[in-house]
Amino acid sequence: PFERLSSIEGLAGAWQMVLVRDARDGLLQRQTRLIAGDLERFLAELSASLREGTYLPAPLLRADIPKRIPGQTRVLHIPTIRDRVVERAVVNTIAHDADRIMSPCSFAYRTGIGADDAVHHLATLRDDGYRHVLRTDVEDYFPNLDVEDALTVLAPVVGCPRTIDLIRLIARPRRARGERRTRSRGIAQGSCLSPLLANLVLNDADHALNDAGYGYARFADDIVVCAPARDDLLAARELLGSLVAAHGLNLNE
């Protein structure tokens, strides 16, 4: 995988995807225009730095995005265009392998699967008699998850230590411009790699709840557990809470 993602061809494909996304608002960033003006050199130098082990990601850019609720914002930490190309090349290379080990009850950030499928799954469970529902979510999931938990799940299926080391390098907490402190945990919301890794952190919980016979669905950090009887949900809540706690996380009450 590492040879493929670090090749000029792999990076060129990733660049095209980053370029399209950057152009959606009709105005390319200055950094994007500069790269496009000397693309061949950019790709060659980036490929060489990855293969020689000299590549280092730049500080993130903080962006505060207003939420629908007045006065509240969502904080994004956005990589540079150069780092986005590397992240996209990684995702393009490993996404299929990662998807193979995910539970069918995990519905977020997956190609060909989405919220409508989650709703259909829950409706089917209801019709099958799973009419008692526990709905919860993980408290501050993205800022508090441990990237190493995702890499532990990912490493055996990727089978390439250099790829795992690169993911660790670009996904580990690092400083954002204008911020004095570096995060000790969590993953940057604004990185295309974040959703994939976030899905994998709770992969064990997904499989455990499903294997225990509960009706189950997860969409990112939102979780629904269904059971035929209300009392069953107490045991389900205890099991889910212990699995989440094993990752240093908590369920919202």
Cite the ranges covered by each PLM segment.
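Conserved polymerase palm-domain catalytic core
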Residues: L50, A63, P104, H120-E253
